[in-house]
């Protein structure tokens, strides 16, 4: 998982939803001594993008898994085991591989051509239905 700041000029911390996609803002920060500072060319590690709640497919970076309201930061997952929020889990099956398209979770089929867009927006394989609106997924 990745802990990162949000851009308050784009979103309030209250706009972020657990299990929802997050997107790149185009800004990168260096995390040092519990503080995010804009990254410079002298920074080589611990640089992380800030995130927003909406974006284009090529800005998709992960799924929000934790919200830190006090520090106006979130944690997002790019792989591993995590939960994804949907409007109705009955539309999905265990073992389905899913990706984000226009902010919605969609299912890959055996005939889906794996484009750069599909590869970059793949969320993972559904491992369980936690509730009517929450899926468990795994991505290696």
Question: Language model features by range: what are they?
Answer:
Residues 1-140:
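Extracellular receptor-binding modules and their adjoining Ser/Thr/Gly/Asp/Asn-rich linkers
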């Amino acid at each position: 998982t990745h802990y990162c700041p949000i851009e308050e000029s784009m979103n309030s911390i209250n706009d972020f939803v657990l299990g929802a996609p997050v997107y790149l803002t185009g800004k990168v920060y260096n995390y040092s001594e519990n503080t995010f500072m804009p990254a410079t060319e002298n920074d080589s590690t611990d640089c992380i993008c800030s995130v927003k709640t909406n974006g284009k497919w090529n800005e998709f970076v992960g799924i929000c898994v934790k919200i830190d309201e006090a520090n106006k930061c979130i944690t997002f997952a790019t792989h591993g085991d995590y939960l994804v929020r949907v409007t109705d889990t009955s539309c999905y099956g265990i073992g389905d591989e899913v990706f984000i398209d226009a902010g919605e979770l969609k299912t890959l089929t055996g005939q889906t051509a794996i484009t750069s867009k599909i590869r970059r927006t793949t969320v993972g394989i559904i491992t369980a239905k936690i509730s009517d609106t929450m899926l468990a997924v795994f991505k290696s």
